[in-house]
């Protein structure tokens, strides 16, 4: 028998939860991907997508289809759905949905700074940013020469200001410092999101905590592996790890002292969930990568979110599943476009 709070949940959030579950029913199945992978041209792909929930989302494209057009339209469709959720949400769901956008904002800022470091014009970089993470001051990012300047001139009035306290320094924004800044921002963001979900309690906390714990631990594994062969010290590396995952504290300390991939794998062996992820990784170039193995595990966690009702986790899970779906469609489209059919089935199906 549902408790009072669950009945109350439906008063403010029931309509949107029902809607997101309806949208989830339109996510492409394995059979849809088999059909897409058999397409010979991008026009064939467009016709097949018209038979799914994507419908006529490419109908207004009169010229020859390109990968970037397909990618843009997929993101625009997801953005439209997300804006509908947020525009009709009540607190605390509104804040929860805003939290989802912050990771995209971080990625956009890093993309713009990195592009500027390589003398790329800002007008060329902005279209590459994810629309879920766009904000008004975005184009001004290129004027900052160090993190403190970036914060004071641009980010102080954005939601990311709260995550920026650990990033403030006078160090020049070179590639190494930009990566450190990305990881510090993500650390603060994930820890804040975790606390917010914990505060909501109930099923939202029950569903979201394992998802965010996995995200925190995935970042710790990737930070460790990417730091091998760089100037980053073990002490500095440990400061970048989010502390809201299952690895905290012992696992993170072991990762901080790891010297190579095998030692990272040994740390994963202590955690059944991550041992299975690392065991699924192939050694040859054509086999499954660690990134793919992490994506597969993420999909499982997000699909599980739909097994419970009366919680916010379904909104996060839906956005992440659609993001993977977009990656799958773009991957298949690229293989068709480049006539690289041997790898066309290397997508990650959701259902």
Swiss-Prot record:
Alphabetical GO biological process terms: vacuolar acidification; vacuolar transport
GO cellular component: apical plasma membrane; early endosome; plasma membrane proton-transporting V-type ATPase complex; proton-transporting V-type ATPase, V0 domain; vacuolar proton-transporting V-type ATPase complex
Entry coiled-coil feature ranges: none
Keyword annotations: Hydrogen ion transport, Ion transport, Transport
Superkingdom of origin: Eukaryota
Alphabetical list of SUPFAM superfamilies matching this protein: V-type ATP synthase subunit C (SSF103486)
Listed GO MF terms: proton-transporting ATPase activity, rotational mechanism
InterPro entries in alphabetical order: ATPase_csu/dsu_sf (IPR036079), ATPase_V0-cplx_csu/dsu (IPR002843), ATPase_V0-cplx_dsu (IPR016727), V-type_ATPase_csu/dsu (IPR035067), V-type_ATPase_csu/dsu_dom_3 (IPR044911)
Subunit structure: V-ATPase is a heteromultimeric enzyme made up of two complexes: the ATP-hydrolytic V1 complex and the proton translocation V0 complex. The V1 complex consists of three catalytic AB heterodimers that form a heterohexamer, three peripheral stalks each consisting of EG heterodimers, one central rotor including subunits D and F, and the regulatory subunits C and H. The proton translocation complex V0 consists of the proton transport subunit a, a ring of proteolipid subunits c9c'', rotary subunit d, subunits e and f, and two accessory subunits.
Record's function text: Subunit of the V0 complex of vacuolar(H+)-ATPase (V-ATPase), a multisubunit enzyme composed of a peripheral complex (V1) that hydrolyzes ATP and a membrane integral complex (V0) that translocates protons. V-ATPase is responsible for acidifying and maintaining the pH of intracellular compartments and in some cell types, is targeted to the plasma membrane, where it is responsible for acidifying the extracellular environment. May play a role in coupling of proton transport and ATP hydrolysis. Regulator of osteoclast fusion and bone formation.
Similarity section: Belongs to the V-ATPase V0D/AC39 subunit family.
PANTHER family: VACUOLAR ATP SYNTHASE SUBUNIT AC39 (PTHR11028)
Protein name: V-type proton ATPase subunit d 2
Lineage: Eukaryota, Metazoa, Chordata, Craniata, Vertebrata
Encoding gene, per UniProt annotation: ATP6V0D2
């Amino acid at each position: 028998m549902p408790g009072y709070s669950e009945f109350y949940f439906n008063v403010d959030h029931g309509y949107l939860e029902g809607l997101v579950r309806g949208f989830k029913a339109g996510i492409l199945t394995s059979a849809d991907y088999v059909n897409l992978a058999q397409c010979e041209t991008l026009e064939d792909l467009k016709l097949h997508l018209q038979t799914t929930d994507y419908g006529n989302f490419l109908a207004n494209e009169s010229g020859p289809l390109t990968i970037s057009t397909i990618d843009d339209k997929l993101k625009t469709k997801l953005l439209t759905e997300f804006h509908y959720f947020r525009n009709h949400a009540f607190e605390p769901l509104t804040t929860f949905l805003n939290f989802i956008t912050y990771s995209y904002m971080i990625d956009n800022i890093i993309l713009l700074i990195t592009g500027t470091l390589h003398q790329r014009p800002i007008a060329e970089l902005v279209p590459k940013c994810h629309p879920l993470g766009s904000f008004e001051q975005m184009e001004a990012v290129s004027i900052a020469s160090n993190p403190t300047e970036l914060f004071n001139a641009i980010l102080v009035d954005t939601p990311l200001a709260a995550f920026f306290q650990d990033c403030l320094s006078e160090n020049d924004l070179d590639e190494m410092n930009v990566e450190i800044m990305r990881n510090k921002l993500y650390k603060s963001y994930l820890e804040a999101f975790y606390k917010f979900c914990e505060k909501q309690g109930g099923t939202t906390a029950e569903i979201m905590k394992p998802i965010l714990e996995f995200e925190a631990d995935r970042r710790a594994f990737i930070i460790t592996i990417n730091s091998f062969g760089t100037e980053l010290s073990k002490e500095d590396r440990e400061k970048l790890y989010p502390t809201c995952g299952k690895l905290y504290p012992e696992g993170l300390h072991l990762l901080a002292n790891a010297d190579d991939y095998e030692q990272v794998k040994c740390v994963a062996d202590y955690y059944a969930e991550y041992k299975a992820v690392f065991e699924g990784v192939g050694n040859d170039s054509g086999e499954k990568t660690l990134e793919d193995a992490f994506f597969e595990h993420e999909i499982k966690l997000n699909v599980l979110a739909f097994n419970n009702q009366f919680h916010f986790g379904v909104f996060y899970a839906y956005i992440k599943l659609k993001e993977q779906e977009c990656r799958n469609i773009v991957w298949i489209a690229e293989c068709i476009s480049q006539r690289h059919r041997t790898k066309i089935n290397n997508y990650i199906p959701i259902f």
